[in-house]
């Protein structure tokens, strides 16, 4: 199982939000490229980058910084989300060297978009499903839809997505522990890799996910816990490799 450090970008800085709220952001660094380097040195095998300004505006706002990170660390596979609403943006990121592009809001509002992208860019499309109480959230988590998260995951599996990132937004950034039960439930319903996200606080969370990783959980995204020092990346990855 991969332990994937998260870099969330807002106004060119590396921040963490609580429960996805843009008005509740903690700035951890003014230099996201340096932060990426720190995770590379600690042994990161993949990086998760989100353009938060892009997620709100609907178009990339931190693409320059993301391109810089990818250029600086060409051997590090990177997945990027936030504000990706058309195939031109996908093309720009893939041309820059990004490995996977994450589709969030538009996957829910226009599901055929994911199907089109999977045909155009096979193997490079990941869907991010952010849910609360089993329902999918959209627009930077500011709205809850009527869509059931498992139904949507099964739909995107048919489209040919490379993976599904599942975030329990009631836990995200709250350091309350990962929602293992709902993550397993989703992973059991599909055959594509599921990446867990939201609420990872300490090594116990990593252990709990490792114990069920055979259900189809291939990775876990860790944010605030790395920045606040409650998880050491090298230690967490060593645990996940056992």
Curated annotation (Swiss-Prot):
One biological process term in Gene Ontology: L-histidine biosynthetic process
Catalytic function, reaction form: 1-(5-phospho-beta-D-ribosyl)-5-[(5-phospho-beta-D-ribosylamino)methylideneamino]imidazole-4-carboxamide = 5-[(5-phospho-1-deoxy-D-ribulos-1-ylimino)methylamino]-1-(5-phospho-beta-D-ribosyl)imidazole-4-carboxamide
EC class (word): isomerase
Principal subcellular localisation of the protein: cytoplasm
Subcellular location: Cytoplasm
Keyword annotations: Amino-acid biosynthesis, Cytoplasm, Histidine biosynthesis, Isomerase
Annotated metabolic or biological route of this protein: Amino-acid biosynthesis; L-histidine biosynthesis; L-histidine from 5-phospho-alpha-D-ribose 1-diphosphate: step 4/9
Any one Gene Ontology molecular-function term assigned to this protein's record: 1-(5-phosphoribosyl)-5-[(5-phosphoribosylamino)methylideneamino]imidazole-4-carboxamide isomerase activity
Active site, renumbered: 8 (proton acceptor), 130 (proton donor)
Origin: domain of life: Bacteria
Cellular component GO terms, alphabetical: cytoplasm
EC number: 5.3.1.16
PANTHER family to which the protein is assigned, alphabetical: 1-(5-PHOSPHORIBOSYL)-5-[(5-PHOSPHORIBOSYLAMINO)METHYLIDENEAMINO] IMIDAZOLE-4-CARBOXAMIDE ISOMERASE
HAMAP family linked to this entry: HisA
Protein family membership: Belongs to the HisA/HisF family.
Protein name per UniProt: 1-(5-phosphoribosyl)-5-[(5-phosphoribosylamino)methylideneamino] imidazole-4-carboxamide isomerase
Upper lineage: Bacteria, Pseudomonadati, Pseudomonadota, Gammaproteobacteria, Chromatiales
